[in-house]
Amino acid sequence: PEINVRTYCKKREKHGIYFFSLDTPEPLTRLGGSSRYHLPYRKRRIRFQKESAHQVSVQSYRTDEQLDLDVRYCGTGLPPEDKDAELIAWTTERYHLFSVNRNGHLFHGEVHHPEWPVENVTFSLSCNRLLQHFGITHQPADLAHYSRGVDTFAAPLKATND
């Protein structure tokens, strides 16, 4: 399991994503992602539990066992409203990854994936401290959707010359 905090960005017409953090208990994922892609992986204990055929519960704990995230969600299987289509495409059709190494140098690379299948979601969020480390206060979601995911491939990153 993995939990990420990201933002959407653009550089020279390349629409991409930048990760503030990627949390996982998996040591090989953290090592590979940090060394090969300069991604900010953090060690976390993540409890992922399927509570019913459709409902999932996720809790994330820091290494000191403080709860960072507690959410329950359920994909409805229903497609999003047409009025949300442009925003959904803007957030999911990103084909570049940006990252910064420890020396502050910017890197980028292509990301390959099929279109994300998106559906409506119901959710209950009882704890979200994932953004506190960055000085950002959690705000209630204006819009939320769910995807069962797609396979992605990130090409090796290259240094950006500016």
Predicted regions and their residues:
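Internal, well-folded beta-alpha domain core
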Residues: 4, 8-162
